[in-house]
Amino acid sequence: MDQREIVEAIATLREYGTETYLIEAKSAKGGFPKCYDTISSFSNKHGGIIIFGLSDSFQVEGVYDVEDLQKKLTELGKNSMSPPVHLDISPVEFEGKTLVAAKVHELPLSEKPCYYTKGGIHRGAYTRVGESDEQMTPYEIYAQQSYKEGVPDDLRPIERASIDDLNGEEIIRYIKKVKSEKPNFAKNDDRKIMRLSGICNDNKPTMAGMMVFGDYPQAYYPQLFIACSSMPGKELGELGGDGQRFNDNQRVEGTIEQMLSGALGFLQRNMKTKVIIDLSGKRTDIPEYPIRALREAVTNALVHRDYSKYTERAYIQVYVYSDRIEIINPGTLYGPNRIDRLGTDTIMEARNPNIIRLLEEKYPAIDGDLMRALENRHTGIPTMRREMAKYGLPEPKFIEGRGLFKVVFYNNSHDSEPDQVSDQVSDQVSDQVSDQVSVILDYCNKPRSLKEIANFLGMTRSYVSRKYIVPLVRNNQLVRTIPEKPKSQLQKYYRNCR
């Protein structure tokens, strides 16, 4: 880590007026500050830089003792973190005083999660959320450990269920099909084939078996459904012309195949259709969104959602707003999969390989919506992008939150803000952010906290801070109530009407 990298990091802090996902500032004028939480969070996410010797307003204070601070940092990483963390530590002269910077590298997946040893894994493991270090949830810890240990959650048996809860006719057809396609299977009896295929375990249906062949999976897991809602406006809670909160509402249940069909039916029923009649009088109906893109997204939500014990009470959500469709499924991205590499990596690891295999083996290669989507495995996201482009619509947005993954499709009513706003924040605010700028500014006619703004928008605080608040403060459209302490827990924001 060279001095230029440190100086650029300080410039970023001052420009944005806040810490970032990758940069943390610590005051160290009066002694060695607490930083095990930041070391843990950077190690568990994408790494980062800690700069010691800056005030809350990012002015240079210097450190109490350069040599002692470096020694304690090294000891903390080596002796107090599990696994031990190697820190790249660099003292630097800046604005007449000495600072100390520590670069924390992301740990390999095989070594995560990193935690403060004294706190133990459940109290000492942290993750980076926007500009803050947050204690990891039991689910976040489990997600990293289960990947590391290769835990097949889709093969866990459903103890209260029996083989009789599976659709016998479909099981018979499946066994007949795999026997014809896999001669080595033909020598086994049906029960053994079901076990080898992952349909059952110790004569109990597995999660994969239930979600693919179950008579009624929701009898055992009531929350494994899709909640579909058509909203009258652009935000949750916005009322329609007749005072209605929803235009349409449906709970979609069944197997993965049945839920895909039900969700697509709901989406088609609640989107606009353009009718084109050519010179010959032939009528063509063009839906508001490309059905193929939606099919890919819903299939991904069903097939790749987390089916572990930590998320079995969480359901998939489908929202149809006036300007967009949102599809939200429980579970973080699996293993090494990254949001910035979606649709570009040719090798992506699957969370539920047994569910995917059963679906592929169950259906003929040309049969139905589900098989068409499964055939596009590893190309589903490029397909979504390509289909949206064919319709002249914006690229879909992919958002990873804490314990969830969201896909957003915008229609043609998703317009950008006036030029003045979009010019001011074009390098910081994406298309979906600019659509919300006026809403945020109106809401902040009186001072609002980050939590209030995030709850109002129905988004996470880290996402709102990064995508909305930081650019608007930077451009003087929002003003802090406590400008001298940007990180204050009492901080609020209000619209600059000057």
Each PLM stretch: what is its role?
Residues I325-L374:
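Glycine-rich/acidic phosphate-handling loop/turn and adjacent ATP-lid/helix
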Residues P394-P396, V473-E484:
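A short, conserved structural fragment
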Residues Y289, M459-R474, K487:
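Short amphipathic alpha-helical interaction segments
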Residues G124-E312, Q317-I328, Y334-P336, D340-D345, ...:
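Active-site helix-to-loop segments that bind/position phosphate- or nucleotide-bearing substrates
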Residues P84-S162, R313-A314, E375-E400, F405-K406, ...:
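Intrinsically disordered, low-complexity regulatory tails
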Residues S434, R480-R498:
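Short, cationic-aromatic polyanion-contact patches
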Residues N445-E452:
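Short capping segments at the starts of secondary-structure elements
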